[in-house]
Amino acid sequence: VYKRQELYLKYHDEEWGQPVTDDRTLFEFLVLESAQAGLSWITILRKREGYREAFHHFDVEKVAQMTQEDIERLMQYDGIVKNRLKINSTINNAKLFIAIQKEYGSFYKYTLSFFPKQRAIVNNFKTLSQVPATSPESDAMSKDMRKRGFKFFGSTICYAFLQAAGFVNDHLEDCFCKAVR
């Protein structure tokens, strides 16, 4: 239990909600959040290094070129969640991610296009029960991404992605991270 709490705290204190503009890191968060569908976040955090190794340290160009042989190899690899649909979707999503980069100049710019003021939203919640699972921005972005062919990226996963990458600041009012983000 302590190691789990330690891993969560380190992620919360050092990464979660920290503004990300780098497309490689955004792709990493997209992959990890998608992998989490139906699972606990701690499961994915524990396997994060495995995901980095399995998916070329989130080099989107290399991931997009992965083959059926790579998929079969990953189905035997304990470093990630061995779910064929999720592995396939990671490769598919990489190809679509690249298409968005070409269309918008970067995935960061694409993501920001769903925010009317072109900047992060800072919410002022006092309790966890106030934090929503989705938002109008996550609804619109996930709808657009699904239309483009992305898999495992519904509005709830999209909202978690937006939180993780700092597009939505949902640190509670009494959280020390609130002031530094």
Language-model-derived ranges and their functions:
Residues 57-134:
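Alpha-helical ds-nucleic-acid-binding substructure associated with the helix-hairpin-helix region
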Residues 26-43:
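Short, aromatic/basic-rich helix-turn unit that serves as a nucleic-acid recognition element
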Residues 10-13:
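A short, charged helix-loop
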Residues 31-35, 52, 72-75, 91, ...:
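Amphipathic alpha-helical segments within well-ordered protein domains
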Residues 111-132, 136-181:
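Catalytic DNA-binding helix-loop module of base-excision-repair DNA glycosylases/AP lyases
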Residues 1-2:
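Short, small-residue-biased leader/transition segments that mark boundaries at the very start
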Residues 41, 45-54, 86-94:
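Non-catalytic DNA-binding core/recognition domains of DNA-processing enzymes
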